[in-house]
């Protein structure tokens, strides 16, 4: 539900559209003339796909990429008219929906191509496809590393099927965000195989109209990598960097702004005396008089339980406040002894503040990546969109349901 009226200040994610624009422009400056396919899968990495896609469209994105048909249809219902690519699997029975909504889908095996073509013919149309080349990710795609010639033959067979229209070729780098010598060589080999596949298709009379291989790390590290490919047919496909985070600890650029700030409010303040405990398992016992604030959020909202017992840091009135005891499903406690002015209903920044954690520091503390932290913000958390400091939209999935 898109709204601009006040929302319940319980827990919410503020999405900075200015930062989103800045990040897109930073990628565009690096990519030069290469068109950009903005990746908005997983609800734009937790930021809200429709609102983010609208910004990318305004900024000149050429394509949008999602993971599944449902995400693509959501964008169409949200008024997005840009070409959309589904990067993953779509069951052949939904061929009619692909055709009706003008959605392109990944084609990654002979069996999938045949089933999709048959369903498209039965629906009275043709599905547009981008051939997915597996050059070393080992996920989905025509297996070029296993048997290059056989993979090309399968691609050409797919191109000839009556229910399919091949309009592109793509692949995905698996270690472009790792600058170790071995992985640099592996990425270069992936690129070499991809270029070889393009030219094999071209030689057989099936030259793809569009080719794309660069993810976030690829486009920033190797903007020259249309090398070996016709630049006028190439496109880059950035993801995490659009939302303000570098691809990895090894590959850092320093030019992106985090887009999401996760906030909640203080529900209660109390003084704990030595010997008193907080939260499940009695993992925190006060050793001295301690002022404790209870916050209206927990792991059901996407705040990781692994940040229990002092690992997490929340910001209140510009002061870093450590988490006390275990994070609960819907509530958590923090030490506000050093925040004398704290009051009930005051805002607390869970991540994205000046002295609080960031999605990146949380990822390090919980042995994961910022992608997972951002995507983990649950649907019950409203997304509040700000532009030049003003709230311009609110997305609240619970109210919509």
Regions found by a protein language model. Give the residues of each.
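Hydrophobic "anchor" residues on beta-strands that sit immediately upstream
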Residues: 37, 128-130, 168, 322
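Fold-independent oxyanion-binding glycine-rich loops
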Residues: 40-42, 68-69, 89, 108-110, ...
